[in-house]
From Swiss-Prot:
GO biological processes: defense response to bacterium; humoral immune response; innate immune response
PROSITE patterns recorded: INVERT_DEFENSINS
Cysteine pairs bridged by disulfides in the record: C3-C34, C20-C39, C24-C41
Pfam families: Defensin_2
Physiological role: Antibacterial peptide. Affects Gram-negative bacteria including methicillin-resistant Staphylococcus aureus.
Gene Ontology cellular-component annotations: extracellular space
Swiss-Prot/TrEMBL keywords: Antibiotic, Antimicrobial, Defensin, Disulfide bond, Immunity, Innate immunity, Secreted
UniProt-recorded name of the protein: Defensin
PANTHER family per the UniProt record, alphabetical: DEFENSIN
Expression triggers: By bacterial infection.
Family classification: Belongs to the invertebrate defensin family. Type 1 subfamily.
Record has Kinase as a keyword: no
Subcellular location: Secreted
Organism (species): Trypoxylus dichotomus
Amino acid sequence: VTCDLLSFEAKGFAANHSLCAAHCLAIGRRGGSCERGVCICRR
């Protein structure tokens, strides 16, 4: 959801990746990133 919700990039900074990482941290994971529009959390 977070990857498609705010998928924009400004000066090389992708806000959707930050939101995905924050989502993953909130559920107890070690961060994450977007891959093909899907938020993938690290284990």
